[in-house]
Structures are given as C-alpha cells and as structure tokens.
Amino acid sequence: MNALVTGVSRRIGIGFAIAERLRADGANVFTHGWTPHDAAQDWGADDLEADVEADFAEPDAPARVVVAARAKLGPLDTLVVNHARSGDGRLADLTAEHIDAFLHENVRASLLLVKEFAQQFEGDRGAIVLMTSGAHLAPMPTEVAYGVSKGALAIAVATLADELSDRCIRVNAVNPGPTDTGWGLADVDPARRMPFGRWGEPDDAARLVAWLCSDDGRWVSGQVLDSEGGFRRW
C-alpha cells in the first residue's frame, strides 16, 4: 500500500494517528502538513515535520502534493483526506472571505486531491477516505462554515464512489466524533455525554480508517461512517 495522508502536523492529532496506524499495517505513507495553520490556532503547532508542507488555500497545492507523494512512493493506491480548516464562528460573524476560506480548503482542495489521485492511479484496487464531521447529524453551534464544508464532503461520497467504482477505487467518509486532540473539550463532562466515559482518542478514528483502506474493507464503498462512541448530543 502506498498512501498519502493529508493534515499530519501534530503528534496528538488524528492525521498522525492515521499515518502511524497505516505504517504499522505495513503501508508506505507520505504525509502532508501545514504548520502555519496550527501555529495560528489555540492549540498551536509542534515540531512534527511532514513529508511536504502545502497551503490548500492555493488552487494548485493538491496537485503539487500528489505529485510529491508519487515521486517518493511510486503510484499511490490509498488517499486519506484528513486536513481541515478549523476555527469558526457564529452566523453573525461570517464574512464572504471567511466562508470562502473554509470552502476552498475543506471542499475544493479535497475534491482536487481526489481528482489528482484518481488520475495517477494505476492499480486494480484503491481506497479513498474523506474525514467529515457530525454536521449531518445535529447542529454544530459556532461552526457554521466548518459544518457546511464538512457536510459537503459527506454528500459528495456517494457520487465520488459511483464515478470511481469502475476503476475499483472505493470512496468512504469517517466522522470521528468528539476526539481529544488536546483542546476544546475540557469544559464538557464526558461521563454525561459519552456512554464509555471518555472522549474519542485519535487512534479510535485511525483504526477505522485503516480498516477501510485495507483488504478487509474491500466491500464497503459510498458510506459515511459515524465513529462517535455513542456520543449523546442532547
């Protein structure tokens, strides 16, 4: 397996857990990150170095990342689109520029990554996993633009899976649910919201993604899988 994983810039993040899980399963993994985004957020960046740094706000960045991954690994057969622009606000705070930033980085870049991956694909069996959110399940207060952008990916899965099925490329999406990546959950009691008494961990999502990318998941395509540990929203 030759896999490209985007959004790998923090050791405590889901992207890093996915890359490590795929490597443990024997895959060759090429990672993408964009440190300036994390550095500008409350959680900050760490010293993790991805194989390539690229800003998906730039229209040509997806093509450059796929080319770089193929140059190092050879033809790619697995793509995990994990990157995301985060840090949203309420409806009253939205601007056109704010909305565009989320759509460009979370939707446009993701679709272009899928396109570039499919164009270079040469194998007889491939897998793509998009990372979405719980926006299709319930309201996400203060995350309007983020929720819309992630919801778009969930909606796109069925169409992408259909278009790529004749080439034996499966497409699925994973909603990892509330996951402890070091920020944002301290003021909510997991004992009340989570039946198992804890928040999700990055490896919880990584195990599901790795399964979807493996031969064991070969009969699953066009699905949005909610891996939330029974999260109670209300």
Where are these regions (language model features)?
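Canonical Rossmann dinucleotide-binding motif of NAD(H)/NADP(H)-dependent dehydrogenases/reductases
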Residues: 1-30
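Substrate-binding pocket helix/loop in short-chain dehydrogenase/reductase
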Residues: 90-91, 98-103, 190
